[in-house]
Amino acid sequence: MGDVEKGKKIFVQKCAQCHTVEKGGKHKTGPNLHGLFGRKTGQAVGFSYTDANKNKGITWGEETLMEYLENPKKYIPGTKMIFAGIKKKGERADLIAYLKKATNE
C-alpha cells in the first residue's frame, strides 16, 4: 500500500487540474472521482464519457487503477483523458492510496 500524503501531493500536481474527489464535487475536464472504487468505467453521473470508457466494462480498484494510471490511452484506447501516465509504480501506489481514502470520505 502506498503513502497517502505522498499520494495527495501527486494528485495536486498531476490530477487536480481536471478532477475533484470530494462528495458532491463538480466535474471539471475529467469526472469527479468520489465513489471511484467499486464503480465501473464511464459511470460517474452527469459526466459525458467516450464510448471507449463506457464500454471498457472493468470495475475500478487497486489493480485496475495501477494498470490504467501507468498508461491511460493504452489501457482504454479512445479515452479523452490526455494524461501520459505515471511510470513509477511507487508513485502510482501512493496516488491510489490517496484516492482510496479521499474518494470515500
UniProtKB/Swiss-Prot annotation:
Query: Which key words are in the record?
Result: Acetylation, Apoptosis, Electron transport, Heme, Iron, Metal-binding, Mitochondrion, Phosphoprotein, Respiratory chain, Transport
Look up the coiled coil feature and give its residue ranges. none
Which parts of the sequence carry N-acetylglycine? G2
Note the InterPro entries from the entry: Cyt_c-like_dom, Cyt_c-like_dom_sf, Cyt_c_1A/1B
* Any one GO molecular function term: metal ion binding
Subcellular location, record wording: Mitochondrion intermembrane space
Phosphotyrosine modifications at = Y49, Y98
Principal localisation: mitochondrion
Where along the chain is heme c bound?
Answer: C15, C18, H19, M81
Top-level taxonomic group: Eukaryota
Residue positions where N6-acetyllysine is found in the record: K73, K100
Which GO cellular component terms are attached?
mitochondrial intermembrane space
UniProt GO BP? apoptotic process
The entry's family comment says: Belongs to the cytochrome c family.
Name used for this protein in its record: Cytochrome c
Q: Which gene encodes it?
A: CYCS
